[in-house]
A protein has these predicted regions:
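Charged/polar, solvent-exposed surface patches and flexible loops
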Residues: 10, 28-35, 158, 173
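Short, contiguous pre-domain boundary segments
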Residues: 7-13
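Active-site/substrate-binding loop(s) of hydrolase catalytic cores
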Residues: 72-81, 88-204
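Soluble metallo-hydrolase cores and metallopeptidase-like ectodomains found primarily
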Residues: 26-80
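Well-ordered alpha-helical segments embedded in enzymatic catalytic cores
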Residues: 25, 29, 167-170
């Protein structure tokens, strides 16, 4: 393991895969990825009611970090979102590890040959900070996790149409600016009897 690999270990990995980072640790790690590579940029797409930035990472091999430049590049645009329900943190930790591997391992950089990635590690930033060990008691880890709804007690995953939440209003503006070709929304089950560790569903 190289010195850079050690430097870029995620909070989740350092904890022995038992703990997920809080908001401050997550944003700090996002900025570390930005500083460690020219192909990842940290920005935000809005601010939550409690004043937290809504973090966004952009990964592009040719530093196309605007909607206009991505469109001109001809790349497919992939939007990956995690922690719309902050108790379901697997997507956040996996996404940060994926971007880390892309910038630190040459064999992964080919993933960006024809694709630009937008990654939202935490959508519901305020609910994310209501950390507790009993928020999803039937779920297999992490030791503590965030709360399902926002500071205004809104479920963002039920707000795409009515857009009551300031977070969703910011998300819709961001989505319409970027117009991604493919959208992955990461969730975690809290005890349902799925036959596989990872599953996916496609809306058609």
């Amino acid at each position: 393991v190289s010195a850079q690999d050690n430097l870029l270990l995620t909070f989740y990995e350092k904890s022995g895969f038992r703990k997920t980072p809080g908001y401050a640790e997550t944003v700090a790690y996002c900025k570390t990825l930005d500083e460690a590579s020219e192909i990842v940029k940290y920005t935000n797409f809005g601010v939550s009611p409690e004043g937290r930035e809504l973090p966004l990472l952009i990964a592009d091999k040719n530093q196309n970090f605007t909607p206009e430049s991505v469109k001109l590049s001809g790349n497919a645009l992939l939007l990956i979102q995690a922690c719309i329900h902050p108790g379901e943190s697997d997507g956040k930790d996996a996404g940060l590890m994926l971007l880390r591997d892309i910038i630190s391992k040459k064999e992964y950089q080919k993933l960006l040959d024809h694709v630009t990635i937008l990654f939202i590690p935490i959508f519901n930033t305020d609910g994310h900070e209501r950390f507790g060990p009993y928020n999803r008691i039937n779920q297999n880890g992490p030791d503590e996790m965030g709360w399902r709804t926002t500071a205004q007690n809104l479920n963002l995953n039920r707000d795409f149409m009515k857009a009551d939440a300031p977070e969703m209003q910011a998300w819709l503006k961001m989505f319409n600016q970027w117009l991604p070709d493919f959208f992955v929304d990461c969730h975690t089950t809290d005890g349902a009897d799925f036959q596989y560790t990872m599953t996916y569903a496609l809306e058609t």
